Amino acid sequence: MTAREFLEATEKEKLAPYATRSADSAGRTLHGDEPDDYRTCFQRDRDRILYSKVFKDLQHKTQVFLINEGDFYRTRLTHTLEVAQHARTFARALRLNEDLCEAIAYAHDLGHPPFGHSGEETLNDLLKDDGGFEHNIQSLRVVDFLEKRYQRYDGLNLCFETREGIARHNTTHDHPDTPPEFQNYSQASLEAQVVNIADPLAYCAHDLEDALNAGYLRMKDLRNMENPLVRRVFERCSSRYPDFLKADTVLQSRILVRTLIEEANIAVIRQTSRNIELYGISSVEEARSLPEDVVAAPAGVWKNFDALKAYLFENVYRKPQVCIMNEKGKLIIRRIFHHLEKRPEMLPGIFKTRFDEAADSSGKRRVLADYISGMTDRYVMDLYMMMFEPYEKVMFEFRE
């Protein structure tokens, strides 16, 4: 028995009947590949994503605050790691496939362009007549086609279930159309649903901590919120830590966010366990055939969480400083896009080849979106300076 076969047997014994087992995977449907002797297929997917260049680039991509504004804010990479940690917690508690959850979590933001959601909005507007730009679908495009690590094929050649989790990543803010390939079931796997709920929980918690540390929010403003969830979190903080309100802002924010995460995680695990029992779910197929998600928080808790996110939107994301950062990012992307569209000879290597080979103007604009969305914040700002600032030096290596 190989190490992989032992791990697959362990999954069969330990995982819940509604969990996705690696031995039952639909496999690598894009390109055939021999199984590994010591890793399951989902462990292999996770490792392929972790070692990819595009994953490393997430450390230099904006979450909310531009990278060059300070090195103590979350980046797209730290966000991804926190989503994966939430997903592992849920998977372990619910006896789901932790490796699949982790792989989907690591890949869910690979298609995000520089400058966060403002960058995505700009590319979507630039491609409004060409199918638009949506970062979840772009993430699938990255792992299927754009990332280069193997001679035999483009992309990372991930398993069907990992790719489905990327394509069907669905949150309050993200509603991509499900590609036909993944429409066999009304619902995604429970592992994909876990990542779907881990994502907004993670970004709300860490955006709150970053905003408090940046001085965009004050602790007393949060204490005065008419939000039962926030009020309960403050009560728990005060009862657990008698000197909580006397601590400095940084320590207060860490205690507050840690307690908020704990409240949210407990609520999700309990509600999901109730849903599994309520529906009598005993197989993967049953979980996938339901009219609604199984992995969920209680309606009241989620309503309060949405209210907290709305509060952050009004009091952080609309701050003048953040708006200026966002508009700066939009201007940079838009100007580079239009300039490259007129002067494609400025495109490096493989992107120039793809641009020339594109069948029509729509295809050419898609190549430009692929190129720009793969840039880090720092690189796109350097490229902007190189293109438009007369005294900026241009003798540096272009990225492929």
Swiss-Prot record:
Gene3D superfamilies: Hypothetical protein af1432 (1.10.3210.10). It comes from the Bacteria. Signal peptide: none annotated. Transmembrane segments: none annotated. It holds the Pfam family HD. SMART domains: HDc. InterPro entries: dGTPase, Diverse_Catalytic_Enzymes, dNTPase_2, HD/PDEase_dom, HD_domain, PHydrolase_assoc_dom. The keyword Transferase does not apply. Residues 76-204 form the HD domain. GO terms for molecular function: triphosphoric monoester hydrolase activity. Keywords: Hydrolase. SUPFAM superfamilies: HD-domain/PDEase-like. HAMAP family: dGTPase_type2. Belongs to the dGTPase family. Type 2 subfamily. This is Deoxyguanosinetriphosphate triphosphohydrolase-like protein.
